[in-house]
Amino acid sequence: MASWGSCDFHELRDLNERIKAAASEQEMDAFYTGLLDEMMNGLLTDVKELTPVDRGHLRRNWFITKAKRSGKVYHADIYNNIEYAPYVENGHRQEVGRYVPAIGKRLVNGFVEGRHMLREGLFDLQRDAPDFIKTKSEKFLSRMMEGK
């Protein structure tokens, strides 16, 4: 019988061990929560930039929660606890002809359009997320393959 030579598979065994070690649940959990936290920080920055400013109170009160795992799902929240935030986001009705002393004029329009800062920020996040996730995943996998 002919001999085809010998193969040393120690590098493949090492790679398999590194994958098992890096793919531990704790490391994967840390990767996913870190990824979501970074995405939420970017969203927070975008939403704050899109928020209109009079005295800055609305802009200063945007907050995010830390990413959490619930079963197989990771989630985080963005919120603004100012009572008039939904009216700035979505718009609101107003009484035409009413005098407003703060601006010294009567109201002319029956509806004030919303600024949609959260909605626009979420659209930007959805647009940019695939490339961001791909880049971070590639870095994570390359670290895993190098054994770092």
What are these regions (language model features)?
Residues M1-Y79, E83-A85, E95-K148:
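Short, Lys/Arg-rich flexible segments
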